[in-house]
Regions:
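Zinc-dependent deaminase
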Residues: 1-40, 56, 102-164
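Stable alpha-helical structural segments in soluble proteins, enriched in small hydrophobic residues
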Residues: 30, 37, 74, 78-82
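Short, basic and Ser/Thr-rich N-terminal targeting/leader segments
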Residues: 41-45, 92
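Short beta-strand scaffold segments in enzyme catalytic cores
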Residues: 45-54
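Short hydrophobic alpha-helix segments
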Residues: 58-60
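A short, polar/charged loop-to-alpha-helix boundary motif
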Residues: 66-76
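Immediate flanking context of iron-sulfur cluster ligation sites
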Residues: 88-101
Length: 164
């Protein structure tokens, strides 16, 4: 589902199908990062930044415990990695994939990086940025949510079940 997208035909085009398949493949890469976080005892959230040609130019997973840094969220690490790769602070033609809806802090950073797209898996009803305001993101950033949502949600649920 996309926000504020122009009216489209109810019948998916081949471009829509290709984009969905690509989104799922790239969300699987973010899930690999989330699994790495889980293995490190971190909340399992993962993120990847993808260039317009489909190359992954930034990866990140939560490292708040290991780094003892409350800002070491998957998105922040992936964005910083991509900026280093490009040698630029703006990611205007890139797409950020993240397994869980970003928090307000990460949404603010995403706004300043200005990616073309933000794609997330599962919604975060407690601390996701949309609980505060959808206006945090840059107005030109296209948002898609719900990609592999069940897989993303299950990884989080399993992590918290294992910790109890």
């Amino acid at each position: 589902m996309s926000w504020d997208s122009p009216r489209r035909s109810p019948y998916p085009s081949s471009d829509d199908a290709m984009r969905r398949r690509s989104d799922e493949d790239l969300m699987r890469e973010a899930l690999r990062e989330a699994e790495q976080a889980r293995e490190e005892g971190e909340v399992p959230i993962g993120a990847v930044v993808v260039s317009p040609d489909g190359e992954i130019i930034g990866r990140g997973h939560n490292q708040t415990e290991g780094l003892r840094d409350v800002t070491a969220h998957a998105e922040m690490i992936a964005l910083t990695s991509a900026q280093g790769h490009l040698g630029a602070k703006l990611l205007t033609d890139c797409t950020l994939y993240v397994t869980i809806e970003p928090c307000v802090m990460c949404a603010g950073a995403i706004r300043w990086c200005r990616p073309a797209r933000l794609v997330w898996g599962a919604d975060e009803p407690k601390v996701g940025f949309t609980t505060v305001s959808r206006e945090i993101l840059h107005p030109r950033t296209e948002v898609t949510s719900g990609i592999l949502a069940d897989d993303c949600r299950e990884l989080m649920s399993r992590f918290f079940r294992e910790r109890r």
